[in-house]
Swiss-Prot record:
Belongs to the insulin family. This is Bombyxin A-3 homolog. Keywords: Cleavage on pair of basic residues, Disulfide bond, Hormone, Secreted, Signal. It comes from Samia cynthia. GO terms for molecular function: growth factor activity; hormone activity. Its main location: secreted. Residues 1-18 form the signal peptide. It comes from the Eukaryota. It is found in: Secreted.
Length: 98
């Protein structure tokens, strides 16, 4: 536990010093960094909207998995986990969620 806290303190210090190298942020680390950068006012997760039309993505001839893949290819903004947990992201990308 102490090691994790030390690591987070060092990470926050590096970000405060202007280090803009991409890092991977997941779980608690992501929440702490958002809280620090956004002054405790980052966007909270909303309940997903689902309807019978959006569930099928309007493409009834496609399998649901393939329809979701195609829907994502239209330039829809990814969630913060996709941007910062699955791949490294910068402080500027994190600030986009404030």
């Amino acid at each position: 536990m102490r090691t994790q806290v030390l690591f987070l303190v060092l990470e926050v210090a590096a970000m405060a010093s202007g280090d803009d190298t991409p890092h991977v942020y997941c779980g608690r680390r992501l929440a702490i960094m958002l809280s620090y950068l956004c002054d405790n006012q980052y966007l909270m997760k909303r309940t997903p909207y689902t309807s019978s039309e959006s569930e099928g993505y309007g493409w009834r001839w496609l399998a649901p998995q393939r329809a979701r893949q195609l829907a994502g290819a239209r330039g829809k903004r990814q969630g913060i986990a996709e941007e910062c947990c699955n791949k490294p992201c910068t402080e500027d990308e994190l600030l986009g969620y404030c």
